[in-house]
Curated annotation (Swiss-Prot):
The keyword Secreted does not apply. Residues 80-92 have a biased composition (Basic residues). It holds the Pfam family Ribosomal_S19. GO terms for molecular function: rRNA binding; structural constituent of ribosome. This is Small ribosomal subunit protein uS19. Residues 73-92 are annotated as: Disordered. Keywords: Ribonucleoprotein, Ribosomal protein, RNA-binding, rRNA-binding. HAMAP family: Ribosomal_uS19. GO terms for cellular component: cytoplasm; small ribosomal subunit. PANTHER family: RIBOSOMAL PROTEIN S19P FAMILY MEMBER, SMALL RIBOSOMAL SUBUNIT PROTEIN US19M.
Length: 92
């Protein structure tokens, strides 16, 4: 289900404030955030945002193609190690 257009995109207010401070200051520092649900807006383009994946912060460099997506899409939370092979089937 898509978000209502009259509500606008969700961006955590502190994340938005930190990105605006980075832009105003002219520095390209990394902004840490736990807000994986925040939508990437055109203001974020060119910024590096460290998104928490539950264990560590994954740096995400925002490009124009990412606008409209959520930050959590670019910070995977699970690492698939593969199914058990023939070697591991009998051992326990």
């Amino acid at each position: 289900m898509a978000r209502s257009l009259k509500k606008g995109p969700f961006v955590h207010y502190k994340l938005d404030k930190k990105v605006q401070e980075n832009i105003a200051g002219g520095n390209k520092g990394v902004v840490k955030t736990w807000s994986r649900a925040s939508m990437i807006t055109p203001d974020f383009v060119g910024q590096t945002i460290a998104v928490h994946n539950g264990r560590q912060f994954v740096p995400v460099y925002v490009t124009e193609n990412m606008v409209g997506h959520k930050l959590g899409e670019f910070s995977p939370t699970r690492s698939f190690r593969g199914h058990a092979g023939a070697k591991n089937k009998g051992k326990k």
